[in-house]
UniProtKB/Swiss-Prot annotation:
Source organism: Streptomyces coelicolor (strain ATCC BAA-471 / A3(2) / M145)
Keywords (A to Z) from UniProt: ATP-binding, Helicase, Hydrolase, Nucleotide-binding, RNA-binding, Transcription, Transcription regulation, Transcription termination
Entry EC number(s): 3.6.4.-
Name under which the protein is recorded: Transcription termination factor Rho
Keyword Transcription regulation: yes
Residue ranges annotated for the Rho RNA-BD domain, each copy included: 52-119
SUPFAM superfamilies from the UniProt entry: Nucleic acid-binding proteins, P-loop containing nucleoside triphosphate hydrolases
Stated role: Facilitates transcription termination by a mechanism that involves Rho binding to the nascent RNA, activation of Rho's RNA-dependent ATPase activity, and release of the mRNA from the DNA template.
Superkingdom in the source lineage: Bacteria
């Protein structure tokens, strides 16, 4: 019965009172607080909370300090609610916060009710830059039925941990898009506690649709018909949103396709007056991509940000080669894809010898470390194509990696 009566109470009692706020000297937030108490008492879902007067979205702070609440794809829209610089300062809001507030005339927020799902409290919020980064030591398993053999191969050759900063080095037509979809399915299936974000930059619209339909997570896109500055703005807002979640102690996984295109966008948007490096790259073009990729970390205080980003190679562009050479040393995990197996329709087209993870022993048990090092030595002893095909064939015969390692360990070289 309460579910029927409460909207009527709001319509006939609460909203008329709202017109008296100035004379009563009572803020919107105070009335909403009382309204929330009524909602809880009547056991009504919070989603009914002041539907006509509440706006929510991810905060984007523009030049000059004014804020806007971005919607589903984090792209600017004319109807995005605005926040004044004073309101942002009063509540200590940061770019990337999920803000819920009272929306007055002209789509402008007059007060803030919740920040990231909680009551605003600027004093208890840590700053991302103050969190202590650690080597990843908690496993992010990609072995999952929805990931096929790809997840199992990565767990064996280049294990991923929470807070990993990984590059997927991909020549053209080596299956990187399908690989990202499989990774997304594995993360969603094995780690429902993690917030999954897929970021597609300078991509074809049909690829975006395919990704949205196949991924159980948040998919953000800026297609090839948008400007370089729009690509950059989306990437910056996504990474700021991820930082706010990590500050709250959450685990976030970002799959970016691609880091190379983000570098291209920064280079195209850079002023032509700067110093030019190899391949026509502006000297400051890599600062933005490095900030994005460098945000990945495991925080000692809790929370983590994992970024697996594709890097395009063998494209015929000197600039793309330069981007990769500059960025490859910043990661702590690398998965190399190869054209040779891909041309023979052997997938996942992983290059076993060139793939690996720094400090992988922190993610593995002692027995796993010994077994995987023996497996890598056995693969190095073969040529790349033969080693990969043998590995995939043996994996198909076993239900999981644990069984596979038990079966092959007696035959692996010691050392």
């Amino acid at each position: 019965m309460s579910e029927v009566l409460f909207p009527a109470v709001r319509r006939r009692v609460v909203r008329p009172l709202a017109r008296l706020f100035p004379s009563l000297r009572m803020s919107h937030a105070r009335v909403l607080e009382r309204t929330d108490h009524m909602t809880t008492t009547l056991e009504h879902p919070p989603v009914q909370h002041a539907q006509a007067d509440i706006a929510s979205g991810v905060l984007d702070i523009e030049t000059g300090g004014k804020g806007r609440l971005r919607g589903r794809n984090l792209q600017p829209e004319p109807a995005d609610p605005a926040l004044s610089p004073a309101l942002i300062r009063r509540h200590g809001l940061r770019r990337g916060d999920l803000v819920e507030g009272v929306c007055g005339d002209r789509r402008t927020l007059t007060d803030v009710v919740r920040v990231n799902g909680r009551t605003p409290d600027r004093r208890s919020r840590p700053h991302f830059a103050d969190l202590t980064p650690l080597h990843p030591h908690e496993r992010l398993r990609l072995e999952h039925p929805a990931a096929g053999l790809a997840g199992r191969v990565v767990d064996l050759l280049a294990p991923v941990g929470k807070g990993q900063r990984g590059l997927i080095v991909a020549p053209p037509k080596t299956g990187k898009t399908v690989l990202l979809q499989q990774f997304a399915a594995a993360v969603a299936g094995n780690h429902p506690e993690a917030r999954l974000m897929v970021v597609l930059l300078d991509e074809r619209p049909e690829e975006v649709t395919d990704m949205r339909r196949s991924v159980r997570g948040e998919v953000y896109s800026s297609t090839f018909d948008r400007s370089a500055r729009q690509h950059i703005a989306l990437a910056e807002l996504v990474i700021e949103r991820a930082k706010r979640l990590v500050e709250a102690g959450e685990d976030v996984v970002i799959l970016l396709d691609s880091l190379t295109r983000l570098c291209r966008a920064h280079n195209n948007a850079a002023s032509s007056g700067g110093r030019t490096l190899s391949g026509g790259v502006d000297a400051g073009a890599l600062l933005g991509p490095k900030r994005f990729f460098g945000a990945a970390r495991k925080a000692e205080e809790g929370g983590s940000l994992t970024i697996l980003a594709t890097a395009l190679v063998e494209t015929g562009s000197r600039a793309d080669d330069f981007y990769f050479e500059e960025l490859k040393s910043t990661g702590n995990m690398e998965l190399r894809l190869s054209r040779e197996p891909a041309s023979r329709r052997v997938f996942p087209a992983v290059e076993p010898v060139g793939s690996g993870t720094r400090r992988e022993e922190l993610l593995l048990s002692g027995a796993e470390t010994t077994a995987l090092r023996g497996l890598r030595r056995a693969l190095v002893a073969r040529d790349g194509q033969s080693g990969l095909e043998t590995l995939l064939e043996r994996l198909r015969r076993t239900p999981d990696n644990a069984t596979f390692l038990r079966q092959v360990q007696p035959t692996l070289p010691a050392g």
